[in-house]
Amino acid sequence: MTQMYCYQCEQTAKGTGCTAFGVCGKSPEVADLQDLLLYVTQGVSQYAHRARALGAIDKDVDVFVTEALFTTITNVNFDEERIEGLIRKAGQMRDRAKKLYEDACRKTGKTPETLGGPATVAIPATRDAMMTEAAKHGVA
């Protein structure tokens, strides 16, 4: 079992966060996958924010960001496969937002910024690889 640190809800013991297993029933694996989902979603948002500043908006990207964030703040669905699917979709949405941003830059004569971190992290092909990647970006 991996180390866990989850502090997102009011159910945490003594208000300090859960470190072994969530009081709500969340497993350390789900917490890790949620951390990775948040990290990749930050990359989506980095591009979407810059595109929006140039007047380019993709409502599907915006809806996805909301869906991803909502997935991590509600303690009602700890389906690892669903979260894994959202991580993969986050990679697709990030690529879509990047293209939107780069196209907006071309149209406005701006040079696109070179982003790093969550804007460039590779989406792992397997669950095990996702868990390894999540360990690099979580709060535990």
PLM regions: where:
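Metallocofactor- and cofactor-centric catalytic cores in central/energy metabolism, strongly enriched
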Residues: 1-140
